[in-house]
Amino acid sequence: EMLRSLSVNNNRKIPEARLFELSHVYIPVEGQELPDEREILTLGMYGNGIDFFGLKGCVEELLDNMGIKKAEFRPETENPTFHPGRTARLFVWKNGERKDCGILGEIHPEVAKKNECPQRIYVAMLDVATLIEASSLEKQYQQLPKFPAVTRDLAIVVDDNAYVADLMAAIQEKGGQFLENVSLFAV
């Protein structure tokens, strides 16, 4: 349904769109007569300046607003609906347990063409129950620090095959309680 909505917007000469949809998806389960019903939040977007990282940023903002502190994006190459080099699977943690929360990325050009969509369509499909289960909206009071924060920009060179999630985890582990924020970018 999301691809159809994006296609309609594109065909009406709307230069960019950012849409969301909340719907039920029925997934067949081997050995069961009835399928598994899941509520899915779908985000879809296209337009100038919109790319995978823009979509990922929207998902990260959602996770932050829901109080989900630990999430991981891993490359996904097996889903034929998505472009294999521009897709990630999202995992979230609750009580130390990693849960598959969904997928996000660029729709495969062949799928976009079949649906009469512009070439670069970005979609995220997130399991609502998993998001809610991992969320924590409790606000905690934090005392102001005795000393002002120090911001450091570090430039490091890493192997092209290194995963951002692994780098973030290593930096956060070594930074410990004194590290407040890590932001990675590529040049």
Set out the residue ranges of the language-model regions.
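A carboxyl-terminal module marker
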Residues: L19-F20, V29-G31, D36-T42, G49-V187
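Polar, glycine-rich mid-to-C-terminal structural blocks
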Residues: E1-E30, R38-E39
